[in-house]
A protein has these predicted regions:
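Catalytic loop of the DD-peptidase/beta-lactamase superfamily, centered on the K-T-G motif
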Residues: 25, 42-60, 68, 72-274
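Active-site-proximal loop and beta-strand segments within enzyme catalytic domains
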Residues: 1-31, 39, 45
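Short hydrophobic "helix-edge" motifs at membrane interfaces and signal-peptide entry regions
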Residues: 36-37, 146
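Short Gly/charged-rich anion-binding patches and loops
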Residues: 8, 36, 53
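Conserved tyrosine-mediated DNA breakage-rejoining catalytic core shared by Y-recombinases
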Residues: 64
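Catalytic-loop motifs flanking and including active-site residues across diverse enzymes
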Residues: 29-36, 156-160
């Protein structure tokens, strides 16, 4: 019930000490990154991140994407069908000596039980009821109305692809400027690389807010890509060399074995057509 209490969340974040010494490790900020940047926007501009995005970006460039939605917009939202936690895999991993496990299962088991993963994905749930009902939580009014910049944006594939297309074509569209080209170049420069202590120890590469290489996903299939993956198989990216934007969004999460398979196939077909 606290997701709509922005002040509570950012005040708790301000009190939080770094989980490891800055510069010594990479750990994906599944939730906190959006609140950190959103609070900077609010303090500089006065508007919430959702209002700022709507008035300065979505409305100006006709991008079908929102951060925090109103109740009269719920009818446009597809119900999320969440993938249940792989309990059988986890229980199997706990019973078998670690050295006998296949490397993929060992990696998953290590990550799901790690302190970094739990802090990023589990301990943010404030009650046992939320943990038990995590698969239904994204469909609740509280989640949809809250402004959670790193996690609960709502939009269409066309909207996400258009956003990345603008960035991939110099940052302007129809005489309106979204970002300077120099800013885009800086944001898509590599600043951090894995192994990521939250994301399965994978060799993820990040710019400023953008993934530059994300194992198993489309991002990184070409070294000219920048974008971000989504939990359950979604992905959006831009390509400044080929001047394209792409997005695949799904309301039913894909399981671990099929994760990003559809997005990868679509991406490969896209690049074959260029």
């Amino acid at each position: 019930e606290c997701w709509e209490d922005w002040d509570l969340i950012v005040n708790q974040l301000a009190k939080q000490e770094p989980f490891h010494k800055p510069g010594t490790a990479q750990g994906y900020h599944a939730m906190t990154f959006g609140f950190l940047l959103g609070e900077i926007i609010r303090r500089v501009d006065g508007r919430s991140v959702g209002t700022f995005f709507r008035e300065e970006i979505a409305d100006v460039f006709d991008i079908d994407f929102k951060i925090g939605i109103r109740e009269n917009e719920f009818e446009r939202c597809a119900e999320m069908i969440m993938q249940k936690a792989p309990i059988n895999v986890i229980n199997f991993a706990r019973r078998i000596p670690r050295w006998l496990l296949p490397s993929r299962i060992r990696m998953i088991g290590d990550t799901l039980s790690s302190a970094e993963y739990r802090k990023a994905f589990i301990e943010i749930l404030r009650s046992e009821d939320q943990i038990k009902n995590v698969t239904a939580f994204p469909n609740t009014p509280q989640w949809r109305k809250a402004e959670i910049p790193a996690a609960n944006g709502h939009g269409s594939a066309r909207g996400v692809a258009k956003f990345f297309s603008i960035l991939s074509n110099g940052g302007s569209r129809n005489g309106q400027k979204l970002l300077n080209k120099e800013t885009i170049d800086l944001a898509t420069t590599e600043f951090s690389t894995g192994p990521d202590k939250v994301l399965f120890q994978g060799p993820y590469k990040f710019g400023l807010g953008y993934m530059l290489d994300a194992p198993l996903s489309p991002i990184g299939l070409e070294n000219t890509m920048f974008g971000h993956t989504g939990i359950g198989g979604a992905a959006g990216f831009g390509d400044k060399v080929n001047k394209i934007g792409f997005a695949f969004v799904n309301n039913k999460q894909h399981g671990i074995g099929k994760l990003y398979r559809t997005a990868n196939n679509l991406t490969k077909s896209l690049y074959k057509s260029l």
